[in-house]
């Protein structure tokens, strides 16, 4: 059996088309959705991510603002800039690209973003609201994964799901969203004693640790859905995920590739979150 491919590029194209239609409708009413992206320092990977986010905004009718600062920017100056953006009615989403230089407290920076503009879904108010099932914003990567399940009709209610990874950005919110959808969820991590014992029982496995080949074919239940959130490089420097794709695709029922799987969905859901913020702001101003 060869797994069916979950194509993140194709689904992203559909969802971005819908986002562009909503953006055009808002713009016609004088409320063009606006996203501000802040980059501090010269991390090459961060620069690529920011460029892709700005391009996605431009391609889909959003107003975008990029603030690029040297790594020497003070924490106080960054917090002051966030405060300005919080009060700017043209801006509906604020994103600070992580990681930040060591002298800046990323937790303090995230908490400085107004919860109603926290389109990454990282603010403690949104993280806490996710626990109740009613967040203003869901973190973009796990939100994108949920859209993949939905688009392919993958049943979550009653399913056994394993999330490998416990980060605040992917692992923990992914587990909460699966739980909210009715799955029975196990979170595995670096201290898990027998990872394979958990994954072999899982109908759904989400790998999100940033470690090559953390999941191999012998660890996967036949017919399971495998979502690869990892972004790594193989020995030849080629982009790869956390899953041994060549082996696992012969066992799984569904699988996401890297690249072209979860990655495009992350930026797409950032657009969706920004649109939802702009729609709320337009409704409040009406």
UniProtKB/Swiss-Prot annotation:
Keywords on record: Amino-acid biosynthesis, Histidine biosynthesis, Hydrolase, Methionine biosynthesis, Multifunctional enzyme, NADP, One-carbon metabolism, Oxidoreductase, Purine biosynthesis
Superkingdom of the organism of origin: Bacteria
Gene3D superfamilies: Leucine Dehydrogenase, chain A, domain 1, NAD(P)-binding Rossmann-like Domain
Sample GO molecular function, one term: methenyltetrahydrofolate cyclohydrolase activity
Keyword hit for Amino-acid biosynthesis: yes
PROSITE patterns linked to this entry: THF_DHG_CYH_1, THF_DHG_CYH_2
Residues reported in the UniProt entry to bind NADP(+): 165-167, 190
Alphabetical list of CDD domains matching this protein: NAD_bind_m-THF_DH_Cyclohyd
Catalytic activity: (6R)-5,10-methylene-5,6,7,8-tetrahydrofolate + NADP(+) = (6R)-5,10-methenyltetrahydrofolate + NADPH; (6R)-5,10-methenyltetrahydrofolate + H2O = (6R)-10-formyltetrahydrofolate + H(+)
Gene Ontology CC annotations of this record: cytosol
InterPro entries: Aminoacid_DH-like_N_sf, NAD(P)-bd_dom_sf, THF_DH/CycHdrlase, THF_DH/CycHdrlase_cat_dom, THF_DH/CycHdrlase_CS, THF_DH/CycHdrlase_NAD-bd_dom
GO terms for biological process, alphabetical: L-histidine biosynthetic process; methionine biosynthetic process; purine nucleotide biosynthetic process; tetrahydrofolate interconversion
Pfam family, one: THF_DHG_CYH
EC number: 1.5.1.5, 3.5.4.9
Pathway assignment: One-carbon metabolism; tetrahydrofolate interconversion
Subunit and interaction comment: Homodimer.
Job description of the protein: Catalyzes the oxidation of 5,10-methylenetetrahydrofolate to 5,10-methenyltetrahydrofolate and then the hydrolysis of 5,10-methenyltetrahydrofolate to 10-formyltetrahydrofolate.
Family indicated by similarity: Belongs to the tetrahydrofolate dehydrogenase/cyclohydrolase family.
HAMAP family: THF_DHG_CYH
Entry protein name: Bifunctional protein FolD
Source organism of the structure: Burkholderia cenocepacia (strain ATCC BAA-245 / DSM 16553 / LMG 16656 / NCTC 13227 / J2315 / CF5610) (Burkholderia cepacia (strain J2315))
Name of the gene: folD
